[in-house]
Amino acid sequence: MKAKKKLGVGLSRQERQVLVIGEIIQELLKAHEAKKDVNLNRMKSLVASKYGLDSSPRLVDIIAAVPQDAKKILLPKLRAKPIRTASGIAVVAVMCKPHRCPHINMTGNICVYCPGGPDSDFEYSTQSYTGYEPTSMRAIRSRYDPFLQTRHRVEQLKQLGHSVDKVEFIVMGGTFMCLPEEYRDYFIRNLHDALSGHSSANVAEAVRYSEKSRTKCIGITIETRPDYCLKRHISDMLSYGCTRLEIGVQSVYEDVARDTNRGHTVRAVCESFQLGKDAGYKIVTHMMPDLPNVDFERDIEQFIEYFENPAFRSDGLKIYPTLVIRGTGLYELWKTGRYKSYPPSMLVDLVAKILALVPPWTRVYRVQRDIPMPLVSSGVEHGNLRELALARMKDLGTTCRDVRTREVGIQEIHNKVRPYEIELIRRDYVANGGWETFLSYEDPEQDILVGLLRLRKCSPDTFRPELKGECSIVRELHVYGSVVPVNARDPTKFQHQGFGMLLMEEAERIAREEHGSTKLAVISGVGTRNYYRKMGYQLDGPYMSKSIEENN
């Protein structure tokens, strides 16, 4: 039997690569016209071997070669990791420079489980990171320069086929608010400048130009600790355009916080939650099951307490099961047999039980750290812990009803389902000294979430002058689904179909008629202020606000 003749004989590797990419694009267009599903990896391998190439072309090279008139058709099929923008936003994680943890001065040491930092085995890494996480490696390559980190990541997402019309920053790398004010201003200024292309003299100028930028900064998330989430820190973060706080809690038990050397009390956690929510922030926390002195039952009890006690009840959660990493105090306890991690199956059971407890207004952002497995001596043994936990829940007949699982974009990617009958659903609850209302547009039959709004009646304890008196605040407005550019309207996508406007109208009605408020404020990302201006809101300090008295 004759061997199949290879095409492109006599051509250079680069020339054959061009032919391969051209043929892949043609095949994808044919499949689209025939309304057929295609296994892209298999197609790439077959076409590459046909031309005698030992490896398939990179996705970024294929995306770059797609003709302009075919981009709308092919980019959704070629997009790498579509989950990255399924929520409607491109997340850009950046890291500040390595610095020591601030509570070393008080307690003499860092938390027992914490890797990284200038004094650790991973000395060029930031506190609580090893330097081998994808975000850490990008930051190290850019020498922790915020401008370069942003530009490189935005460019990378574009090359992978994602729309970066809306960007949300996550400032990682330990407690950002303990760094000198001058450095913080430089860092935030450069994040905004990287999107707008303007070279600003200060944060206020950077924010002003960022408002008009083509790539919108729709929010900034800052990682902090309860003791660096006081009034002055909250006000500084508002001036940066920050809309969400990630607060390290780890445990709701006072004895565990003490024994792991957290350097703050559980009471400080509750106070920081109330201060943050009364200033309009979304609150996301980091929680660590499997810490020393906590068994399986006690872990379950702490999450029941966390979700049911109004002193906690955050808007979002990152579940980070404890990892034993070389160079930490916990590593020494583990080596001498004084600490033992849960077996893998028990950890999957625990996470499944935690996910079953999550209320429908809370979003679980992550279920494990991004630390490479070879650096982990003991702890999580699976890289797909969330998927295993969700599979275990299916076996047990329970479901996870958190925001992320129900998002329309995630449902389209994972389950290929789209909402059929959408209706407005309202949930009220008490949290952190205030009345919270969670409004959402959902398909209740399929349990799919299209958009949400978090409304809070400001408590009398709020310290921000803009929110004093009879005032309510919208802490979050988000319509889910793949990113749609701010001025575009795609009838197959859920963003920009008017759901946001309808949610705001209902929030105004509740604030006026039920809260008895005369003013409604919104904590808005810098790039979305014009959206609220169209609805009659005006800049009021760091907020957008509007009078909602009856005669208006």
Curated annotation (Swiss-Prot):
Binding-site list for [4Fe-4S] cluster: 101, 111, 114
Any one GO MF annotation of this record: acetyltransferase activity
Chain positions recorded as acetyl-CoA binding sites: 166, 476-479, 499-501, 532
Ranges for domain Radical SAM core: 84-374
Free-text comment on the cofactor: Binds 1 [4Fe-4S] cluster. The cluster is coordinated with 3 cysteines and an exchangeable S-adenosyl-L-methionine.
Phenotype of gene-disrupted mutants: Pronounced larval developmental delay and death at the pupal stage with delayed and reduced ecdysone-induced transcription, developmental of melanotic nodules and up-regulation of stress-induced genes. RNAi-mediated knockdown results in lethality at larval third instar or the late pupal stage. RNAi-mediated knockdown in sensory organ precursor cells abolishes central spindle asymmetry during asymmetric cell division.
Substrates-to-products reaction catalysed: uridine(34) in tRNA + acetyl-CoA + S-adenosyl-L-methionine + H2O = 5-(carboxymethyl)uridine(34) in tRNA + 5'-deoxyadenosine + L-methionine + CoA + 2 H(+)
EC number of this enzyme: 2.3.1.311
Listed pathway(s): tRNA modification; 5-methoxycarbonylmethyl-2-thiouridine-tRNA biosynthesis
Keyword vocabulary terms for this entry: 4Fe-4S, Acyltransferase, Cytoplasm, Cytoskeleton, Iron, Iron-sulfur, Metal-binding, Microtubule, Nucleus, RNA-binding, S-adenosyl-L-methionine, Transferase, tRNA processing, tRNA-binding
Principal place of residence: cytoplasm
BP terms from Gene Ontology: cytoskeletal matrix organization at active zone; establishment of mitotic spindle asymmetry; hemopoiesis; instar larval development; locomotory behavior; long-term memory; regulation of photoreceptor cell axon guidance; regulation of transcription by RNA polymerase II
Subcellular location: Cytoplasm; Nucleus; Cytoplasm, Cytoskeleton, Spindle
GO cellular component: cytoplasm; cytosol; elongator holoenzyme complex; microtubule; nucleus; spindle; synapse
Residue span, N-acetyltransferase domain: 398-552
Cofactors that this protein relies on: [4Fe-4S] cluster
Enzyme class: transferase
Positions in coiled-coil regions: none
Disulfide bonds: none
Function text: Catalytic tRNA acetyltransferase subunit of the elongator complex, which is required for multiple tRNA modifications, including mcm5U (5-methoxycarbonylmethyl uridine), mcm5s2U (5-methoxycarbonylmethyl-2-thiouridine), and ncm5U (5-carbamoylmethyl uridine). In the elongator complex, acts as a tRNA uridine(34) acetyltransferase by mediating formation of carboxymethyluridine in the wobble base at position 34 in tRNAs. Binding by the elongator complex stabilizes microtubules and promotes their growth.
Family, as annotated: Belongs to the ELP3 family.
Assembly mode: Component of the elongator complex composed of Elp1, Elp2, Elp3, Elp4, Elp5 and Elp6. The elongator complex associates with and stabilizes microtubules; efficient interaction requires the full complex.
The protein's name in its UniProt record: Elongator complex protein 3
Organism: Drosophila melanogaster (Fruit fly)
Lineage summary: Eukaryota, Metazoa, Ecdysozoa, Arthropoda, Hexapoda
Gene: Elp3
